[in-house]
Swiss-Prot record:
InterPro entries recorded: Ribosomal_uS15, Ribosomal_uS15_bac-type, uS15_NS1_RNA-bd_sf
Protein name: Small ribosomal subunit protein uS15
GO biological process, one term: translation
Coiled coil: none
Functional summary from the UniProt entry: One of the primary rRNA binding proteins, it binds directly to 16S rRNA where it helps nucleate assembly of the platform of the 30S subunit by binding and bridging several RNA helices of the 16S rRNA.
Similarity section: Belongs to the universal ribosomal protein uS15 family.
Organism name: Coxiella burnetii (strain RSA 493 / Nine Mile phase I)
Keywords, sorted A to Z: Ribonucleoprotein, Ribosomal protein, RNA-binding, rRNA-binding
Assembly and oligomerization: Part of the 30S ribosomal subunit. Forms a bridge to the 50S subunit in the 70S ribosome, contacting the 23S rRNA.
Length: 89
């Protein structure tokens, strides 16, 4: 499940640190979170879709790695991001 480019652009605009920022950990985590939410809804309706389940687990793992990176390098940005996204630490 992918996001429409308009949805992605909206997320990038909301979480970017600078004018041309599209790759900061904040932006990447926000995009992954939106994809995870969308795929979680899909999985509720299609419980036996194991291929999508594998993709979901991969996205969750990637998000966790990015969050760990951010936590190691800038704790304040990490805390601000998980609060904005409503994630557990």
């Amino acid at each position: 499940m992918s996001l429409a480019s308009a949805e992605t652009a909206k997320i990038v605009k909301e979480y970017q640190l600078g004018k041309d920022d599209t790759g900061s950990p904040e932006v990447q985590v926000a995009i992954l979170t939106a994809k995870i939410i969308k795929l979680t809804d899909h999985m509720k309706a299609h419980k036996h879709d194991h291929h999508s389940r594998r993709g979901l687990l991969r996205m969750v793992s990637q998000r966790r790695k990015l969050l760990n990176f951010l936590k190691r390098n800038d704790l304040q940005r990490y805390l601000k991001l998980i609060e904005r996204l409503g994630l557990r630490s």
